[in-house]
UniProtKB/Swiss-Prot annotation:
Present with 7450 molecules/cell in log phase SD medium. Residues 187-254, 260-279, 321-344 are annotated as: Disordered. The lineage of its organism: Eukaryota, Fungi, Dikarya, Ascomycota, Saccharomycotina. It comes from the Eukaryota. It comes from Saccharomyces cerevisiae (strain ATCC 204508 / S288c). It is found in: Nucleus. One of its GO terms (biological process) is sno(s)RNA 3'-end processing. Keywords: mRNA processing, Nucleus, RNA-binding. This is RNA end formation protein 2. The gene is REF2. Its main location: nucleus. Disulfide bonds: none annotated. One of its GO terms (cellular component) is cytosol.
């Protein structure tokens, strides 16, 4: 007979099973923590309120079960009392947990209500502890008179607001304390608010200033990394910048335009600072159709480009272009005596150590990588492990590499780390095969070059790799078995072959006639017919 089912219990306002499970899990977590945060305490309050509301509504909905009216069974009473006791049990546990943890979460000097504690001690606590302390002060009405008479309390609370600017809950608690003490209601309310605004603005300004200083430091570091390129005075002489320059530079430019280079004038031009940049002539890359450019003499040979100083060549080309654009009738002719100072100037420019060549060499530059190397000390490392001495084994770094990664091609997989090994392996003794019957050892085995001699009539391709078998082998009729030479000495060595398939001990017909153990064929004895009586 089945148990009666409760039918008159109203559970429309009862808590869901998922909510009860969540409360149970959170209570386990709350018991593990020594201190509870404000979020955890708020969650406990929420659970207490929901359980209290659910319990009150559940009792109202089931008053007929409380009165034990007609048609109320024992199953209904049992379910109602069980749910009610569960709600009460959870309520008592949560209230007790909140009382214990809230007592532990308060600061150790919770009873201290002095201005010195507000100014010096309270900022040292964590934000949660400060909030709990202030909340306890708000609830403790006996200390309100003493706090309202303190002169520097407002400034201390404002400093706490500035300290916990990012925590909104703490700021609300601080403002609530000032409100309960009456600092924001009387004539002092405007002063406290203005002071608080100033402090908060100054704290935000300090944060912004610190961020700006960090950005400036980053910009300075970036500027230091950039290389400053100084332009050449001969090439970058504009009309605006030419007026404040000295007369010596203008006269040298005029003499360069006229093309009259003397030895004394060459010495004066050598004193001018040469630019760190070099320019190459790309005349060798011009097309053959540019015949008019060759007539003007701007196209130079490759030998001149690499022998003559490129700065002087570019200056000369600029002078020729400017003179031709200025007057079409005038022509420029450089005398033969101008070649000597040019050669001297190129020699000096080549010898100058500040000038860096931009010509690429054919050989690529290899970056040197300096690796850290240590001395090979045999007493450096001590290794502990299985099959090693109890006092450990001292090895060098190279031996340690060998231990950690011993498998390399062409090297043995096992190395003897020390001479006095506690475990000595015994050599394999195969003499028992000669003493016992060899038929007992004819079985399927895998020996790749092992000590047992393998004699089988299976081709080598099938012994090494069984993927060459036809998948339709088991569908065909079995072939004729291989005949053994029984007169020969075939049983002196075991016949070893590899079976295939899911089962390693298949029948001969399923193996396609491959032998792995010689089974003698038992023929039926031909007895004389039984006499009929």
């Amino acid at each position: 007979m089945s148990a009666p089912v409760p039918q008159l219990v109203n559970i429309s306002h009862a808590l869901q099973a998922s909510t009860i499970q969540q409360i149970r899990l959170d209570m386990v977590d709350f018991n593990k923590d020594c201190k509870l945060s404000s979020i955890q305490l708020a969650r406990i309050d929420k659970y207490i309120d929901s359980l209290q509301a659910a319990l009150n509504q559940f009792t109202k909905d089931n008053l007929h079960i409380e009165r034990k009216e007609k048609n109320v069974t024992e199953a209904d009473i049992q379910l109602y009392s069980g749910l009610k006791s569960m709600y009460l049990d959870y309520l008592n546990q949560l209230i007790k947990l909140k009382h214990e943890k809230q007592h532990h979460s308060t600061p150790p000097i919770a009873n201290d209500v002095s201005l010195d504690f507000f100014v010096n001690q309270l900022p040292k606590f964590s934000p949660e502890e400060r909030k709990n302390y202030i909340d306890n002060l708000i609830l403790n009405k006996n200390s309100h008179n003493r706090l309202s008479k303190m002169d520097g309390l407002v400034d201390a609370v404002i400093n706490l607001c500035v300290l916990d600017t990012s925590v909104a809950e703490n700021v609300r608690s601080y403002m609530k304390l000032l409100d309960t003490l009456g600092f924001q209601k009387g004539s002092n309310s405007t002063g406290t608010k203005a002071n608080l605004k100033k402090k908060l603005a100054s704290s935000k300004a300090k944060i912004k200033d610190s961020e700006k200083e960090k950005e400036k430091e980053k910009d300075k570091s970036k500027v230091k990394m950039k290389t400053k390129l100084k332009p050449s005075p001969l090439l970058n002489n504009d009309d605006k910048n030419s007026s404040p320059s000295p007369t010596a530079s203008t006269s040298s430019m005029k003499k360069l335009k006229s093309g009259l280079f003397n030895k004394n004038e060459a010495k004066s031009t050598e004193s001018l600072p040469t630019s760190s940049k070099k320019k190459l002539s790309f005349s060798k890359y011009l097309n053959k159709d540019d015949a008019d450019m060759t007539k003007l003499g701007t196209k130079r040979s490759i030998d001149v480009d690499f022998k003559v100083n490129p700065e002087a060549s570019t200056v000369a080309s600029n002078i020729i272009s400017s003179s031709t654009s200025g007057s079409s009738t005038t022509t420029v002719a450089t005398p033969a005596s101008s070649e000597e100072p040019l050669k001297k100037k190129t020699k000096i420019s080549v010898q100058d150590s500040n000038v860096q060549s931009i010509l690429r060499n054919g050989k690529p530059k290899k970056a040197r990588i300096s690796s850290i190397k240590f001395l090979d000390d045999s007493q450096l490392i001590k290794v502990y492990g299985d099959d090693l001495p109890n006092q450990g084994l001292q090895v060098s770094p190279t031996q340690l590499k060998k231990i950690l990664k011993p498998f390399k091609e062409g090297e043995p997989k096992e190395i003897i780390l020390f001479e006095d090994m506690s475990i000595k392996l015994k050599p394999l003794d195969l003499m028992f095969l000669k003493n016992t019957n060899s038929d007992d050892y004819m079985d399927i085995s895998e020996t790749k070059g092992g000590p047992i001699h393998c004699e089988t009539r299976t081709p080598l391709i099938y012994r090494k790799n069984f993927n060459h078998f036809n998948p339709d082998l088991n569908k065909r009729p079995p072939r004729e078995p291989i005949e053994f030479d029984l007169n020969g000495n075939t049983n002196s060595t075991p016949t070893i072959a590899k079976a295939f398939g899911k089962n390693s001990l298949l029948l001969r017909k399923d193996r396609g006639g491959l032998p792995y153990k010689h089974v003698p064929i038992v023929k039926r004895n031909k007895y004389p017919p039984r006499p009929v009586h």
